[in-house]
Swiss-Prot record:
Name used for this protein in its record: ATP-dependent Clp protease proteolytic subunit
Originating organism: Solanum lycopersicum (Tomato)
UniProt keyword list: Chloroplast, Hydrolase, Plastid, Protease, Serine protease
Domain of life: Eukaryota
Catalytic residues (UniProt): S101 (nucleophile), H126
One GO cellular component term noted in the UniProt record for this chain: chloroplast stroma
Function in brief: Cleaves peptides in various proteins in a process that requires ATP hydrolysis. Has a chymotrypsin-like activity. Plays a major role in the degradation of misfolded proteins.
Top-level taxonomy: Eukaryota, Viridiplantae, Streptophyta, Embryophyta, Tracheophyta
PROSITE patterns named in the record: CLP_PROTEASE_SER (PS00381)
Family statement: Belongs to the peptidase S14 family.
């Protein structure tokens, strides 16, 4: 039986009475954002709106984006990435679970030196897919051209964010490439792997 979104007690500063809010709303107030599902237009717009609002609220305080996503639609994912580059606050990206496809693209899009993967996280990159196989011949040609442009964009961004040569990214994206947290660090998708300490919880490790 589904339990729905957990709710917690929260009181706004200056309010005499506490109220119940869903846990994500509470965490948003601490500038903690979550990408925890497949990427589509609705989720993309929600994250973009939150980043813009929190940026306007305090442009000097960092944002934290936790990524556990199998990927999703390319254009909504690029929209999230572009917003991350546009807003004034630095955005930390933290991978837990899986960051695949556009999820890894967004993970790599965090501020350099502020991208982290949990020790058992998995990262996957591959080329963008399309539904052109259902299209008519003319539509197939147009969509194939568009997908080639999108792939070129993703390849260029991955190269910029990871430091890998463009030809390496291009070849690796031809198939599904899965990486452990340490492999993603070596590849340049993240900067650190979080290491669990008995006394101090998780901390980033070079």
């Amino acid at each position: 039986m589904p339990i729905g979104v957990p709710r917690v007690v929260f009181r706004n500063p200056g309010d005499p009475i506490s109220s119940w809010v869903d846990i994500y709303n509470r965490l948003y107030r601490e500038r903690l954002l979550f990408l925890g599902q497949g990427i589509g237009t609705e989720l993309s717009n929600q994250l973009i709106g939150l980043m813009l609002y929190l940026s306007m609220e305090d442009e000097n305080k960092d944002l934290y984006l936790f990524v556990n996503s199998p990927g999703g639609w390319v254009i909504p994912g690029i929209a999230i990435y572009d917003t991350m580059q546009f807003v004034r606050p630095d955005i930390h990206t933290i991978c837990l679970g899986l960051a695949a496809s556009m999820g890894s693209f967004i993970l790599a899009g965090g501020q350099l030196t502020k991208r982290i993967a949990f020790p058992h996280a998995r990262v996957m990159i591959h080329e963008p897919y399309s539904g052109f196989y259902m299209a008519q011949v003319g539509e197939f040609v147009l969509e194939a051209i568009e997908m080639a442009k999108l792939r070129e964009t993703l390849t260029r961004v991955y190269a910029e964010k990871t430091g890998q040569p463009v030809w390496v990214i291009h070849e690796d994206m031809e198939r599904d490439i899965f990486m452990s947290a340490t492999e993603a660090q070596a590849y340049g998708i993240v900067d650190f792997v979080a290491v669990q300490g008995k006394e101090h919880g998780f901390h980033a490790d070079l």
